[in-house]
């Protein structure tokens, strides 16, 4: 079996990726989130597939079909809530994964990092089009507001929006194409995941010390397979508590009202995992400026490998940058909170300050702190 595992054309790919992969011996539980994201992706594809068997992408029947899934399909309620809350778990894992990458300097593996940013954007797109499918009030108005942002693009904006809508408003054509996008995008994500892993295995994993670990590697199996399995069990436990006890805690009550183009909800807001970006969008009074800030809030991550001036890998031995990093995380939480609040004083002002802080920390304060630390340690080589 050992020979077959190492020589078989298909099995040797699995072997070199998950069994005999040389892995740093000191990677902590923060490195578990990659495998958890893989589990989330597989779970989302499977639950989504079963939901697609019963869902109809037609404005007249979409809302009813979701109700039918929850009421009449065997364990349909379970599949539906696993899918909805699974998306939340997916984003929690993804945010932690990115946060770990920033903390431990994993962005220096630039190809892996850039594919990761593409993955984040694609996942956000998938979640957005998926949120439209139940055809509740927040689905409809979320789709209307967010797609309408494209009209801020000079000259071609309005034409582009109507082209995406397939008409003059969000309607049957929009819902049908969003369902098509929502079905195909997870498979595109899976392809990007394979490229992400390909680039990661070219260089090998980073580790908490930030030092070269070539002299201290252990095989992935059994050490990290068992460690990842523990992570998966904890993830599933949290997910099942969410699904079975608090299935609607992360959703919006407005989405239990069928979509009505004649009645606007009091507060239009996206799912919790988009609130930080939504707060940044709203903090700029100009439409085009807001759209650019929204896009840059994710694309700014691509600057990390370029503006890193530290002579050390990661923040483990850099107390000044560490402090700034945790301020950045707190700032993100403030943005998430503001994104869910109404557009009025003092929330607008707090949102504007937090948005300025978000970009300033990444572009100004972190590089400055790195230079100060280099100077303190006299690392001028």
UniProtKB/Swiss-Prot annotation:
Gene3D superfamilies: Cytochrome Bc1 Complex, Chain C (1.20.810.10). Its main location: mitochondrion. Keywords: Electron transport, Heme, Iron, Membrane, Metal-binding, Mitochondrion, Mitochondrion inner membrane, Respiratory chain, Transmembrane, Transmembrane helix, Transport, Ubiquinone. It is a multi-pass membrane protein. A ubiquinone binds at residue 201. It is found in: Mitochondrion inner membrane. Heme b b562 binds at residues 83, 182. The chain crosses the membrane at residues 33-53, 77-98, 113-133, 178-198, 226-246, 288-308, 320-340, 347-367. Heme 1 (or BL or b562) is low-potential and absorbs at about 562 nm, and heme 2 (or BH or b566) is high-potential and absorbs at about 566 nm. This is Cytochrome b. It comes from Phyllotis limatus (Leaf-eared mouse).
């Amino acid at each position: 079996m050992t020979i077959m595992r190492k020589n078989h054309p298909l099995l040797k790919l699995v072997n070199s990726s998950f069994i005999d992969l040389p892995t740093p011996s000191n990677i902590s539980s923060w490195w578990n989130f990659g495998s958890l994201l893989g589990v989330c992706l597989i779970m989302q594809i499977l639950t989504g597939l079963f939901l697609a068997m019963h869902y109809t992408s037609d404005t007249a029947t979409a809302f009813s079909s979701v109700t039918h899934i929850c009421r009449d399909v065997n364990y349909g309620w379970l599949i539906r809530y696993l899918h909805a809350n699974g998306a939340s778990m997916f984003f929690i894992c993804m945010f932690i994964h990115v946060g770990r990458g920033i903390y431990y300097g994993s962005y220096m593996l630039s190809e892996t990092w850039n594919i990761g940013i593409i993955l984040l954007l694609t996942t956000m797109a998938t979640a957005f089009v998926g949120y439209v499918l139940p055809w509740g009030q927040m689905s409809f108005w979320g789709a209307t507001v967010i797609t309408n942002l494209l009209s801020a693009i000079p000259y071609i904006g309005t034409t582009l929006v109507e082209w995406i809508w397939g008409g003059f408003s969000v309607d049957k054509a929009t819902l049908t194409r969003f369902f098509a996008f929502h079905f195909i995008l997870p498979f595109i994500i899976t392809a990007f995941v394979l490229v992400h892993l390909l680039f990661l295995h070219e260089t090998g994993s980073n580790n908490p010390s930030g030092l070269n670990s070539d002299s201290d590697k252990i095989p992935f199996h059994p050490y990290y397979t068992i460690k990842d399995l523990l992570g998966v069990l904890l993830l599933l436990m949290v997910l099942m508590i969410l699904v079975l006890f608090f299935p609607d805690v992360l959703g919006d009550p407005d989405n239990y009202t069928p979509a009505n183009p004649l009645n606007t909800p009091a507060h239009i807001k996206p799912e919790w995992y988009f609130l930080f970006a939504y707060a940044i969008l709203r903090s700029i009074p100009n439409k085009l400026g807001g759209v650019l800030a929204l896009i840059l809030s994710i694309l700014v991550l691509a600057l990390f490998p370029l503006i890193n001036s530290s002579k050390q890998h990661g923040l483990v031995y850099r107390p000044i940058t560490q402090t700034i990093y945790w301020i950045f995380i707190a700032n993100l939480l403030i943005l998430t909170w503001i994104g869910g609040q109404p557009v009025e004083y003092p929330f607008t002002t707090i949102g504007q300050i937090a948005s300025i802080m978000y970009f300033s920390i990444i572009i100004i304060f972190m590089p400055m702190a790195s230079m100060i630390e280099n100077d303190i340690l006299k690392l001028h080589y």
